[in-house]
Amino acid sequence: MHIMEGYLPIGWCIFWAVLSAPFVIYGIWKMTKMIQEDRRVLPLMAVCGAFVFVLSALKIPSVTGSCSHPTGTGLSAAFFGPFITSVLGTIVLLFQALLLAHGGLTTLGANVFSMAIAGPFIAWLVFVGLRKTGKVGIGVAVFITAAVANLVTYTVTSLQLALVFPVEGSILNAFIAFAGIFAVTQIPLAIIEGIICALVAKYIVRVKPEILKKLGIIQDEEIAKIQGEAV
């Protein structure tokens, strides 16, 4: 989904950067506050950031000017919410643009909005909704959350490209074309990413449940159940 350097007109680059900025700025404040309150969250936060970096670096060529890959943001969205995830995603995208030529600096705002903001926000809403029912375990909830974050990211990227490159004057036709091409790779990738994130989440519950409990992600009863499965 990383839109490459120079692929978007400067006006759209500025638009997406301005739109993304408030989310990231608030996310920095929220992240700083959380760390000041309890520094024990730092290792898990770092793991989530590294997870985003590694998964989103596994790119597969796709639409001209972009690519397909997992996003890794669903896990962070589930654990820390969308604002902190927007900061982690921005850091990852900046490093990838500078060190891996993956994405770009002029298109950073557009890539941040799709992968670090839109995907995590919708995914977080899904996660919260599923968990509030009291009937969906953390493994299944994280699986769905990760898959949704992936698919929403590419839906937004399709829209971003369609706004700039309409097909026969039609943004809708362009959106359908871009989304259709992305779907070939992203649907399987979203499922795989969901499985990986679910396994990682359950592993963290087994080895470091107190952090997730403090974050309000999981309660003692479910912790005991998951840890019992590992015996």
UniProtKB/Swiss-Prot annotation:
One of its GO terms (cellular component) is ATP-binding cassette (ABC) transporter complex. It is found in: Cell membrane. GO terms for biological process: cobalamin biosynthetic process. Pathway: Cofactor biosynthesis; adenosylcobalamin biosynthesis. The keyword Transport applies. The keyword Cytoplasm does not apply. It is a multi-pass membrane protein. It holds the Pfam family CbiM. The chain crosses the membrane at residues 8-28, 41-61, 75-95, 108-128, 136-156, 176-196. Forms an energy-coupling factor (ECF) transporter complex composed of an ATP-binding protein (A component, CbiO), a transmembrane protein (T component, CbiQ) and 2 possible substrate-capture proteins (S components, CbiM and CbiN) of unknown stoichimetry. Part of the energy-coupling factor (ECF) transporter complex CbiMNOQ involved in cobalt import. Belongs to the CbiM family. This is Putative cobalt transport protein CbiM 2. The lineage of its organism: Archaea, Methanobacteriati, Methanobacteriota, Stenosarchaea group, Methanomicrobia. The gene is cbiM2.
